[in-house]
Design a protein with these regions (language model features):
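Alpha-helix-loop-beta-strand connector modules within alpha/beta enzyme cores
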Residues: 65-95, 104, 128-138, 142, ...
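Glycine-rich beta-to-alpha transition loops that act as phosphate-gripper elements at the mouths
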Residues: 20-21, 93-101, 119-120
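Short, well-ordered coil/turn segments that N-cap beta-strands
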Residues: 11-16, 51-52, 87-91, 110-112, ...
């Protein structure tokens, strides 16, 4: 599978996705990488440590107490960072978003992959936007309520939908 200008083998190899949250309220690193220069230094460090893809996210999706952003607010966070990373490094860029408008803006800015934590279930335009772009996507499982009877069966059923 081609992501950006790199070929990724889909069998028998593990890849490392480094996370660059440009949010003030991320549960893991809130606010650390909002500054462009600090963020680029962090990307440089992650590349040196073996990162294969950088995943840029502009809205916290922690399990509790995060702020939902408008498309415009999220775009204002991620697009400048996508452009800065693209201009400074030869590394595939993943955009972590579940909103089609943000995905469109990120694709125009140079994102190479869309990482949708809602597995195309939040925004009914997302599949169309990704398909039209020709980019690969990473689909994840998520639920608003963690009401699992049999976790593995429930996750498999959700992903099959």
């Amino acid at each position: 599978m081609k992501i950006g200008n790199r070929e990724f083998q889909t069998k028998g190899h593990t890849y490392v996705m480094g996370i660059l949250n440009v949010t003030p309220d991320s549960f893991s690193d809130g606010g650390k990488w909002n500054d462009r220069d600090r963020a680029l230094k962090h990307v440089e460090e992650m590349i040196a440590e073996g990162m294969d893809i950088v995943d840029i996210g502009g809205e916290s999706t922690r399990p509790w107490g995060y702020t939902l952003l408008s498309d415009e607010e999220e775009i204002a966070r991620v697009v400048p960072m996508i452009e800065a990373v693209k201009a400074n490094f030869d590394i595939p860029i993943s955009l972590d978003t579940y909103k089609s408008g943000v995905a469109e803006a990120g694709i125009l800015a140079g994102a190479d992959l869309i990482n949708d934590i809602w597995g195309l279930k939040y925004d009914n335009r997302m599949a169309e936007v990704i398909a039209k772009s020709g980019l690969p996507c990473c689909l994840m499982h998520n639920r608003k309520e963690a009401d699992y009877r049999d976790f593995m069966q429930d996750v498999a059923a959700d992903l099959a939908d």
